[in-house]
Swiss-Prot record:
Enzyme Commission number(s) of this protein: 2.7.1.170
Protein name: Anhydro-N-acetylmuramic acid kinase
Family indicated by similarity: Belongs to the anhydro-N-acetylmuramic acid kinase family.
InterPro entries assigned to the protein according to its UniProt record, in alphabetical order: Anhydro_N_Ac-Mur_kinase, ATPase_NBD
Residues noted as binding ATP in the record, renumbered to the chain: 13-20
Length: 367
């Protein structure tokens, strides 16, 4: 009988707060479970340099390569900590899947840039490494995002009713899992990104811990309506977005400068919740259960806004109820995609991205 295989997934999302690594166990292409997690926060200097690359500037190519190397050393450190915590050696791992750090996402131009020096990561970890997952989907005419609906479908689908899985990272994305049709999904809009940027600008804090600042504010209805009028929300799916559309400077064009900073933050929380509600209502009105993952689940103000928007129509849950910690889901997805690559299984959710066909995602690097 063939032994089961272990994979590591490493994910650093649009919140740019650090790198998550998750250990999963597979039997060929069959998911058996997640077994461990490690997290390495980004140093402030690294985070600032990554944010600087979001905008055009001098010597971008050199800076991006240097940051790719620094990120890969940090990723290797995170993988090593995970292995140590599980009493494992690199030789115990079949492959490592690394998403990299997105700095540009431009599907309208056929590219999405994730920083990672994958050969260096393979060399540092001594583990076969799979990465550059988005390029293959883009080459097939897709958006290159979101890539997680196929993973959500493999783990979370129910054969009796439509479920949705909501990931709230810097960007929020939804996977819709009908019982009798292919999964689909798309980016609903900003998740934590604008809230984090506003908190950093006005309190010099990385994020609004437990929604404490937002809880002191009131929703500004006129501002909310102006934000909701962005044309992205009226576009049909498949669609994806990022900082290119929803950066702090975009928000500031709608402000007159006299708004209370707590009120703006409170409004941004409702903005995220409302765009999720509108997306589900338009694209998957028969959804009855929604499972939530990502950093946003730790914000009680945002969770209360989601509950108020959905009311009794949709029941909200954590993915922990489906046996996967909400902080582990995205990194686990890229471990799963590495397993798909090894087993030559198409892992692309082409119904979500708009690609012309299912694809085996990623490129592999031996150490």
């Amino acid at each position: 009988m063939m032994e089961t295989q272990l994979y590591i997934g490493i994910m650093s999302g649009t919140s740019m707060d650090g790198a998550d690594a998750v250990l999963i166990r597979m039997d060929g292409g069959k998911w058996l479970g997640a077994e461990g997690h490690a997290f390495t926060p980004y140093p402030d200097r690294l985070r600032r340099q990554l944010l600087d690359l979001q905008d055009t500037g001098a010597d971008e190519l050199h800076r991006s390569r240097i940051l790719s190397q620094e990120l890969s050393r940090l990723y290797a450190q995170t993988a090593a900590e995970l292995l140590c915590s599980q009493n494992l050696a690199p030789s115990d791992i079949t492959a490592l899947g690394c998403h990299g750090q997105t700095v540009r996402h431009a599907p309208e131009h056929g590219y999405s840039i994730q920083l990672a020096d994958l050969p260096l990561l393979a060399e540092r970890t001594r583990i076969f490494t799979v990465g550059d997952f988005r390029s293959r989907d883009l080459a097939a005419g897709g958006q290159g995002a979101p890539l997680v609906p196929a993973f959500h479908e493999a783990l979370f689908r129910d054969n009796r009713e439509t479920r949705a899985v909501l990931n709230i990272g810097g960007i929020a994305n939804i996977s819709v899992l009908p019982p009798d049709a292919p999964a689909f999904g798309f980016d609903t809009g900003p998740g934590n990104m604008l809230m984090d940027a506003w908190t950093q600008a006005h309190w010099q804090l990385p994020y609004d811990k437990n929604g404490a600042k937002a809880a002191q504010g009131n929703i500004l209805p006129q501002l909310l309506d102006r934000l909701l009028a962005h044309p992205y929300f009226a576009r049909p799916h498949p669609k994806s977005t990022g900082r290119e559309l929803f950066a702090l400077n975009w928000l500031e064009t709608y402000l007159d400068g006299g708004e209370n900073r707590y009120d703006v933050l409170r409004t941004l929380s409702r903005f995220t919740a409302q765009t999720v509600f509108d997306a589900v209502s338009h694209a998957a009105a028969d959804t009855r259960q929604m499972y939530i993952c990502g950093g946003g689940i730790r914000n009680p103000v945002l969770m209360a806004d989601l509950a108020e928007c959905f009311g009794t129509r949709v029941s909200l849950h954590s993915t922990a109820e489906l046996n996967l910690d909400p902080q582990w889901v995205e990194a686990a997805a890229f471990a799963w995609l590495a397993a798909c690559w090894i087993n030559r299984i198409p892992g692309s959710p082409h119904k979500a991205t708009g690609a012309s066909k299912p694809c085996i995602l990623g490129a592999g690097y031996y150490y």
